[in-house]
Amino acid sequence: MKKIINKRPLKPKYWILCEGETEECYFSIVKELKLLWVQIQIKKIGQLPWNNKKRIMWEKKKIDYSDKELKETASKVFFILDADVYSQQEIDEQRRLLETNNIHLLYSNKNFELRILLHLEQYTKEGDNYIREIKKHKPNYEKWKSSSTRVILKDIIQHNLKDAISNAKKLEEKHKNLNSILAKNPYTWVYKIFYKEKIN
């Protein structure tokens, strides 16, 4: 009689596609510290010129081909986007395109440094002076200085992740009646990756 082997259920996996090095570093630290209940894979694909939309679809096809577990787990693919270099029309088009291909768009307005700043304070001012504000808490922080930035960023994430989630939720509540992404300033949707609930 053959021995029955009970397969352990596969752990869900998130693929995180991002534009820049700061985002890539951030989520590599999240992975290292095991702050998500799922496996995560991070890939930096650079800023996407939206006159060449096939690029991200190609990345998605490569993921589907290389990661067969995606079809067997409750896994998701996310694209982390800075909103400050796009028009509202481009953002709306991006969102439709990505969601049609089962990619969840998580944007920050104006950019990802807002996400980092929210670990340190509740910030509600319009503009994009996030690095200046971060440096009030962490004077040696720079936008991207390799290992030195990583050490500071790891400390911020390790000790202040709950604050970042709470502060981002407050911004969402503040802007709940606005439909335009660019009108929501400042705003970030990235915190939703830390929730098990459906991402809309």
Give the location of each predicted region.
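C-terminal accessory helical subdomains adjacent to catalytic cores in phosphodiester-
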Residues: 2-11, 24-46, 62-78, 83-200
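Conserved beta-strand elements of the Class I
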Residues: 13-17
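N-terminal carbohydrate-binding/catalytic regions of secreted carbohydrate-active enzymes
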Residues: 49-60
